[in-house]
Curated annotation (Swiss-Prot):
GO terms for cellular component: cytosol. Residues 226-386 form the TrmE-type G domain. (6S)-5-formyl-5,6,7,8-tetrahydrofolate binds at residues 25, 87, 130, 464. InterPro entries: G_TrmE, GTP-bd, GTP-bd_TrmE_N, GTPase_MnmE, MnmE_dom2, MnmE_helical, P-loop_NTPase, Small_GTP-bd. K(+) binds at residues 236, 255, 257, 260. Homodimer. Heterotetramer of two MnmE and two MnmG subunits. Belongs to the TRAFAC class TrmE-Era-EngA-EngB-Septin-like GTPase superfamily. TrmE GTPase family. GO terms for molecular function: GTP binding; GTPase activity; metal ion binding. This is tRNA modification GTPase MnmE. The keyword Metal-binding applies. Exhibits a very high intrinsic GTPase hydrolysis rate. Involved in the addition of a carboxymethylaminomethyl (cmnm) group at the wobble position (U34) of certain tRNAs, forming tRNA-cmnm(5)s(2)U34. GTP binds at residues 236-241, 255-261, 280-283. It is an enzyme of class 3 (hydrolase).
């Protein structure tokens, strides 16, 4: 039988492994109360008061105890999924959880109970209007948050902070669309709906608010995704020492022997709640050593994928001809920071410079060995990322949200151009507003393809 969104489903809702408590969750789908009550009786030997915790034995088909724990019954629609839901909270051993799961499947075979797919409980919450799509994604983001700031921002998204901003924008766009449609539908009227309602002013305010939301979303995406920072340069310029200094731990082997690092060493650190994924790589040079050549090829692959490249130089020699060759190969569009290391050997104080000869490049003078200038480098990385220190009310956002917001921004810009041409482009004005609304609705799931839903929820853990 093909799985459908109305099947009764069950899964272990807690993480694998041993713990004090484990949870098995059942959502009854189309089975409703007719399926829920017999299953509760079979598992618990009694009926449960809705939304009350009951301490009961969990029994097998012969009435023998499997475990004792808390059972909670949530009749629809007042549950996580909006369907009738049963949660069994037992002792968190993997064997106990598997026994309870199998017992549920055996007892529910008659009404088609099956194992839940990844993210299926949250998908049903979305389909039953318990959460919009941005809130549903925030559930996974909260679970996967790697920093306190990311967790707090995901919590704000789950609470609807991001969605409320989007809904407000959509309402304003709809109001403006109504004015344009009225002008199109009643051209013979003497009233100029657009002029009377200050349509251009309304559009300008919508664009301003969208720019603000996009700015906050960029901050939220940075909290979620972090920044990939690749350390690149010739051998023995101090890349591994810099990784250790940034991480505050001895992660990479440091020796005076050129070519010590032959494969990447990665570490994620937090700076003001932003995950910085620091990647130390093999030194870039011509070599006959096959293993080292493989490591160098991987270095260039990492550079291609980087958000920022730290090009390390020896401050005693500065930018050499070999360094120029390396810099010429850096991909366009990837920010590069020149890091002049080993200032402890030159006596140059740690500092950040923007030399005219370097164009848009920033130079950071530091000593990875002594730690001088490391905080300056961290601050420069945050500046490049566009992080606004102390930003309040940031909600977590994903790349798809940024794409939709940018597309809406472009449609509104086109609408503004058409608004200036009035009669010649009024139909196009209305169409651009419709397309902008469509992009905004895609964020909250009011206009979203089934394929996209499948991709989003397949990345959830089973049981959530």
């Amino acid at each position: 039988m093909l799985a459908t969104d109305s099947d009764p489903i069950v899964a272990i809702a807690t993480a694998a492994g041993r713990g004090g408590i484990g949870v098995v969750r059942v959502s009854f789908g189309r089975g409703g109360e007719a399926a829920a009550l017999p299953l509760i009786d079979a598992l618990c030997g009694q009926q449960l008061a809705p939304r009350h915790a009951s301490y009961v034995p969990f029994v097998d088909e012969h009435g023998a105890p499997l475990d004792r724990g808390i059972a909670l019954y949530f009749p629809a629609p007042h549950s996580y999924t909006g369907e009738h839901v049963l949660e069994l909270q037992g002792h968190g051993g993997p064997i106990v959880m598997q026994l309870l799961l199998q017992r549920c499947l055996d007892a529910g075979r008659g009404f088609g109970l099956r194992l839940a797919q990844p993210g299926e409980f949250t998908r049903r919450a979305f389909l039953n209007d318990k959460l919009d799509l941005a809130q549903a994604e925030a559930v996974a983001d909260l679970i996967e948050a790697s920093t306190e700031a990311a967790a707090r921002s995901a919590g704000r998204s789950l609470d609807g902070a991001f969605s409320r901003q989007i809904h407000a924008l959509v309402e304003d766009v709809i109001t403006l669309r109504m004015l344009v449609e009225a002008t199109l539908d009643f051209p013979e009227e003497e009233i100029d709906f657009l002029e009377a309602a200050d349509a251009r002013g309304k559009l300008a305010r919508i664009r301003e608010q969208l720019a603000h939301v996009l700015g906050d979303a960029r901050q939220g995406a940075l909290l979620r995704e972090g920044l990939s920072v690749v350390l690149a340069g010739q051998p023995n310029v101090g890349k591994s020492s810099l990784l250790n200094a940034l991480a505050g731990a001895e992660l990479a082997i440091v020796t005076p022997i050129a070519g010590t690092t032959r494969d990447k060493v990665a570490q994620t650190i937090q700076v003001e709640g932003i995950p910085l994924h620091i990647i130390d790589t093999a030194g870039l040079r011509e070599t006959e050593d096959e293993v080292e050549r493989i490591g160098i090829a991987r270095t260039w692959s990492e550079i291609e994928r980087a958000d920022v490249v730290l090009h390390l130089l020896d401050s005693r020699t500065g930018m050499t001809a070999d360094d120029e060759v390396i810099a010429a190969r850096f991909p366009g569009g990837v920010p590069v920071v020149r890091v002049l290391n080993k200032t402890d050997l030159t006596g140059v104080p740690a500092c950040v410079e923007h030399p005219a000869a370097a164009g848009d490049l920033t130079e950071v003078h530091l000593s990875a060995k002594r730690g001088d200038g490391i905080d300056m480098l961290r601050a420069e990385l945050l500046r490049i990322a566009g992080w606004q220190a102390g930003a309040e009310g940031v909600y977590l956002a994903r790349e798809r949200h940024l794409i939709a917001l940018r597309a809406a921004q472009e449609h509104l810009a086109q609408a503004a151009d058409h608004a200036e041409q009035r009669a010649q482009s009024l139909d196009l004005f209305a169409e651009e507003l419709r397309l902008a609304q469509e992009q905004l609705n895609a964020i909250t799931g009011e206009f979203t393809s089934d394929d996209l839903l499948g991709v989003i929820f397949s990345r959830f853990c089973i049981g959530k």
